């Protein structure tokens, strides 16, 4: 009779059976995740496509709405815009329709993101994740609103003040439809991204990467960084850069307040758990 001796696994876990392949075992869950991702992307793209059709149908009306800051800066008088290439206005409307469609379909996109991420989160994490999706959209809308109602009218007022009307020379602004759209879209995207700062800081605080005191100590460097980023994201004029940087600095201060709140919540939760009897 032969005796087969086995060496115990020092980790305390059973050895995998012969022929076991960890890569093969993980393939099925990975494929399931990829299938789920594909499905969510399809739903999101369908939402964008439907929004694109709707927005392209009303592209001229949407463009007229975006021209309002220009009209206001021109003292309410009718403005004349030009296009110098036959298909230019068509391509401008296509670009505008896609831009507006993403806005219109954002609730669908956010819902699909949540559906994809939620299965990997605990219940309390899912409850904490949803407000961030809503806050992201609302802060982007806030940034777009600041551009539309404050920044863009003042910027256009400044540029129109550079026109020259004299007996010898007439220099006046004749904005191209494509360039005006690119200008206002750049501002909206730039402000929308910069206005996400409180959300980003709060998420970093929840993950334990930053604290309120760290943000206070880093404030002077943050102001320099915000100014530099605003110079990159905003159009190349000082007024736009300042108009983007100042609200973002205020949002940085709001982010500090939010991070302090997160830290207080964490401390209160830890104290409550410490007071609970063991077992």
Kindly label every feature range from the protein language model.
Residues 1-279:
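Membrane topogenic/interface segments and analogous intrinsically disordered interaction regions
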């Amino acid at each position: 009779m032969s005796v087969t001796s086995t060496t115990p696994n020092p980790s305390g876990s059973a050895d995998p059976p012969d022929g076991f392949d960890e890569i093969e075992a993980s393939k099925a869950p990975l494929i399931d995740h990829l299938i789920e991702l594909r499905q969510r992307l399809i739903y999101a793209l369908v939402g964008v496509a439907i929004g694109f059709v709707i927005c392209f149908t009303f592209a001229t009306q949407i463009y007229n709405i975006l021209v309002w800051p220009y009209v206001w800066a021109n003292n309410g008088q009718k403005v004349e815009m030009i296009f110098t290439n036959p298909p230019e206005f068509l391509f401008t409307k296509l670009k505008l329709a896609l831009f507006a469609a993403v806005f219109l379909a954002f609730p669908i996109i956010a819902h699909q993101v949540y559906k994809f991420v939620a299965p990997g989160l605990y219940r309390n994490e899912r409850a904490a994740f949803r407000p961030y999706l809503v806050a992201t959209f609302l802060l982007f809308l806030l940034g777009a609103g600041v551009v539309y109602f404050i920044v863009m009218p003042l910027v256009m007022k400044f540029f129109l003040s550079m026109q020259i009307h004299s007996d010898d020379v007439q220099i006046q602004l004749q904005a191209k439809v494509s360039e005006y759209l690119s200008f206002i879209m750049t501002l909206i995207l730039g402000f929308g991204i910069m206005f996400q700062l409180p959300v980003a800081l709060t998420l970093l605080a929840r993950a334990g990467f930053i604290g309120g005191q760290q943000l206070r100590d880093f404030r002077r460097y943050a102001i320099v960084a915000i100014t530099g980023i605003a110079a990159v994201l905003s159009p190349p004029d000082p007024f736009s850069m300042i108009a983007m940087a100042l609200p973002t600095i205020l949002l940085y201060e709001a982010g500090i307040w939010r991070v302090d709140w997160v830290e207080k919540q964490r401390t209160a939760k830890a104290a409550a758990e410490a007071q609970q009897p063991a077992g």
